[in-house]
Every structure is written in structure tokens, then in C-alpha cells.
């Protein structure tokens, strides 16, 4: 009993980075009172930002990033509730789950609406830009970035994605990138990409003089592969980003790179997302490959998540495949970068066969060309290799996605596994019956 109490106490003192969003009336002293709660609980504030509430004109929303333990976070939540409207509390990744037999498992979303708890844990927010960013000294650009960040931070599951009126400068930047990349796609992009790009032009307004709206793209993808788009303010951690893929949700930025250098961006922007990722998210086999990496990440250790993220990086972002005896590109980072797209098929780039056991050890480079690129025989080949690799990830349970409820089934005991098998048995019966009918028709 003494050991159990000690274990519970240690559990409550686990530390991590948490985020809270709460609203305050626009009155003198309101913020000071709220921040005093953090001070009294000895919680270190890492970042704080305010924005005008979109719910009530008389209120402001406060975004707080802090270093805390479970006990402190619980106390702060209850104290804040007494005189603020707490809109969102996102616990750290390392705060473990409370379900029986899963005490050592990091928290992960169980239903699609749970993504509301992790989609705002961006590593950089709004107008925060590094000193070497092309838009660092451009106050107009920084203000615009904050506008896009606020849209994303206000988004909740089930909301329509707000339509954006892009500026003339943003459309011109997009148009420059769109025009130059489309010159390369016929000789560089894989056939699946080339098949889907015209459909996006037809149904989503992909044009040189128009930046497509995320809501239109999301609706298109839902019909094609069941994927949907969720706006995000910036970089997410690998765990948070991959968890979205498990639900066939792609976290997508909406801001445009700085106009001073349309062929370079140090971070994912709408040109990268819409031209690099979206055409292949409309491809069923590729969509399944992406989702399976996401499912493998749920509840996995930090080490395992990092391995999965590296494999994702060298496939979905910078992957190559073989088609008709030639190398073709399917990685979004390549398909949205004119210079690197030319480089990777120039004959000067180092290329190796994709093998997750080797690939996960490779360093990911962000601001330069990759030292090596990995080639798969096909999406199916990459998928099979990743399936074998994910079997090596230690997890005290299995997971299965339920597309009807858009939730995760945790397979951890005889009952849950039996239920999953019954569902599969029904699906197999349907396929078997169809095969029988086809066979009888052929024999007539």
C-alpha cells in the first residue's frame, strides 16, 4: 500500500509542457488576477499571448504555454474556472493514460474531436519568426501571419474552415510557384500525382491566379479517400501531427511564404501543403499508407514516434518511387521545391532503397537538400515494409480505426479483439458472397 501511494505521488509530479486558453472580460486587473494563480502554484510560464475574442467583443482570449505537473495543472484549471472562462486545456504528451493496464502509455486522442486538444500545440505561433526568416523584418507580413494563426487556433472539430480573402501579393507569390512547378511535374512527378492534379483544378480551383480554399479541398478529399483538412497555425510536434493522420486528418497551414523569395520557405506554407501533399492524399493507396503511420504512433514511446516521423519524412515528404523503369517523385517536400525537385532527378543526388530499419537512422535536413533520398518500388511496397517495421514497436495493445464513429478502438483484451474479428468476419462474408456471384456468372 505504501508503494502504491508513492507511485501515485510520483505519477502526479510528472512534468511537461501544457497549454491553456481562457477568456477574460476587458477590464483592469483581470489578467493580473489570472496570472497570479500560476505564480502562487509556482508554475513557470514559457509563453503568453492575447487576442480579441471571436465569441464576444467585450472579451480577450489568453493563450498560455507553461511548464507544469499534473497536480499543478489540475489546481490551476479549477482556480481559473472560478473567474475566467477556460476554453481549452492541453496536457503534455508525457502525462500518461489512466485506463487500467495502460498507466505507462502517453495520452493520445481516442475520437476525432480529441484533436482539438492537441492541434493548437504549435511550436511557433503567428508572428513569431526566426531572425533568418525572409519575413522577419516585415511587420505587415507578421501581422498577416498572426491573422492566419488566429483562424487556426479558433477552429474546432465540426466547424467549416473559414474562407480567406488572399491579398494580391499572396496570389502573385502562389502563382509564381504554381507556374514554375507545373513545368516540372510532367517529367518529375509520379503518375498518381499527375492523375489527381487536374481533378483539383476542376473541383477545387487550383489555378495560377487563385489560391484554393481549405474547405473546398477538405470536401473533395472526403469524397476521394476519407481524408479531411484541419487548419493549423504552424509546426506541430511529430506525435501531434501523426495522431491526426490516424483519423485521416491532415493538419494544414494556410499562410503564404514571403514574397521576397517565392522559391524558398523554412517552414510548411500553403504552397507546400496544397501542391505537395494534397494531390496524393486524394490517392487511396497513399492515403492508407499515411494513416497507417499515424495509427502506429498512437500511444508509442517518444523513441518510436521519432522513428516513425523520420520514416514519414523520407517517404511522404522526400520519397521517390520507380515507375516504368524510371525514378519519379511522390514526396511533398520535393514536389513543392523547384530547386530540389530538379536536383533529386539530376543524377547527382544519392539514392538508396527504402528500408525503415535503415531509413529511421538518417538525419532529416530542413534548410538544405537531403544527403540521401530513399526510393520505394511502389506505394504498396512502402506500405508493406512499414507494416513489418511497426510490428517492432512495443505497445501493450493494438489499435483499429472505426470510420463510422471516427474513433480509435483499443485492442487490449479478449473482448475487444473478438469484437474486431466479428467485424472483419462480416466484411469477409460480403466479399466471399460477391466472389461467388461473379464465379457463377462467369461459368454460365
UniProtKB/Swiss-Prot annotation:
SUPFAM superfamilies: ACT-like, Aromatic aminoacid monoxygenases, catalytic and oligomerization domains. Pathway: Aromatic compound metabolism; serotonin biosynthesis; serotonin from L-tryptophan: step 1/2. L-tryptophan binds at residues 235, 257, 265, 336, 366. The keyword Oxidoreductase applies. GO terms for molecular function: iron ion binding; tryptophan 5-monooxygenase activity. It catalyses: (6R)-L-erythro-5,6,7,8-tetrahydrobiopterin + L-tryptophan + O2 = 5-hydroxy-L-tryptophan + (4aS,6R)-4a-hydroxy-L-erythro-5,6,7,8-tetrahydrobiopterin. Ubiquitinated, leading to its degradation by the proteasome. Ubiquitinated is triggered by phosphorylation. Signal peptide: none annotated. GO terms for biological process: aromatic amino acid metabolic process; platelet degranulation; regulation of hemostasis; serotonin biosynthetic process. It is an enzyme of class 1 (oxidoreductase). This is Tryptophan 5-hydroxylase 1. It comes from Oryctolagus cuniculus. The gene is TPH1.
Amino acid at each position: 500500500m505504501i508503494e502504491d501511494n508513492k507511485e501515485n505521488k510520483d505519477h502526479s509530479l510528472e512534468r511537461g509542457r501544457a497549454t491553456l486558453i481562457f477568456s477574460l472580460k476587458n477590464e483592469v486587473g483581470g489578467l493580473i488576477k489570472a496570472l497570479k494563480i500560476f505564480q502562487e502554484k509556482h508554475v513557470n510560464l514559457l509563453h503568453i499571448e492575447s487576442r480579441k475574442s471571436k465569441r464576444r467583443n467585450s472579451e480577450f482570449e489568453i493563450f498560455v504555454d507553461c511548464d507544469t505537473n499534473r497536480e499543478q495543472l489540475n489546481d490551476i484549471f479549477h482556480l481559473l474556472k472560478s473567474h475566467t472562462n477556460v476554453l481549452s486545456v492541453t496536457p503534455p504528451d508525457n502525462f500518461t493514460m489512466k485506463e487500467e493496464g495502460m498507466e505507462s502509455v502517453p495520452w493520445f486522442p481516442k475520437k476525432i474531436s480529441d484533436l482539438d486538444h492537441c492541434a493548437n500545440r504549435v511550436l511557433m505561433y503567428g508572428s513569431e519568426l526566426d531572425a533568418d526568416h525572409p519575413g522577419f523584418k516585415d511587420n505587415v507580413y507578421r501581422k498577416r501571419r498572426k491573422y492566419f494563426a488566429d483562424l487556426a487556433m479558433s477552429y474546432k472539430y465540426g466547424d467549416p474552415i473559414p474562407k480567406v480573402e488572399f491579398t494580391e501579393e499572396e496570389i502573385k507569390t502562389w502563382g509564381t510557384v504554381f507556374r514554375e512547378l507545373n513545368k516540372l511535374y510532367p517529367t518529375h512527378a509520379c503518375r498518381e500525382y499527375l492523375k489527381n492534379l487536374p481533378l483539383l483544378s476542376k473541383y477545387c480551383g487550383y489555378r495560377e491566379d487563385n489560391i484554393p480554399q481549405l474547405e473546398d479541398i477538405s470536401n473533395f478529399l472526403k469524397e476521394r479517400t476519407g481524408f479531411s483538412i484541419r487548419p493549423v497555425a504552424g509546426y506541430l510536434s511529430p506525435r501531434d501531427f501523426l495522431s491526426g493522420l490516424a483519423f485521416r486528418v491532415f493538419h494544414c497551414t494556410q499562410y503564404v511564404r514571403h514574397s521576397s523569395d517565392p522559391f524558398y520557405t523554412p517552414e510548411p506554407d500553403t504552397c507546400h501543403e496544397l501542391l505537395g501533399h494534397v494531390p496524393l492524399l486524394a490517392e487511396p493507396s497513399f492515403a492508407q499508407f499515411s494513416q497507417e503511420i499515424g495509427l502506429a504512433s498512437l500511444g508509442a514511446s517518444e523513441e518510436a514516434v521519432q522513428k516513425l516521423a523520420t520514416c514519414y519524412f523520407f517517404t511522404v515528404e522526400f520519397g521517390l518511387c520507380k515507375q516504368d523503369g524510371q525514378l519519379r517523385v511522390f514526396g511533398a517536400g520535393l514536389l513543392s521545391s523547384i530547386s530540389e525537385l530538379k536536383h533529386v532527378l539530376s543524377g547527382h543526388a544519392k539514392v538508396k532503397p527504402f528500408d525503415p530499419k535503415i531509413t529511421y537512422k538518417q538525419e532529416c535536413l530542413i534548410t538544405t537538400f537531403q544527403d540521401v533520398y530513399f526510393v520505394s518500388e511502389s506505394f504498396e511496397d512502402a506500405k508493406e515494409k512499414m507494416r513489418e517495421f511497426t510490428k517492432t514497436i512495443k505497445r501493450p495493445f493494438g489499435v483499429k480505426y472505426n470510420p463510422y464513429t471516427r474513433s480509435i478502438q483499443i485492442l487490449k483484451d479478449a473482448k475487444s479483439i473478438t469484437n474486431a474479428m466479428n467485424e472483419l468476419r462480416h466484411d469477409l462474408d460480403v466479399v466471399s458472397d460477391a466472389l461467388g456471384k461473379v464465379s457463377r456468372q462467369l461459368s454460365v
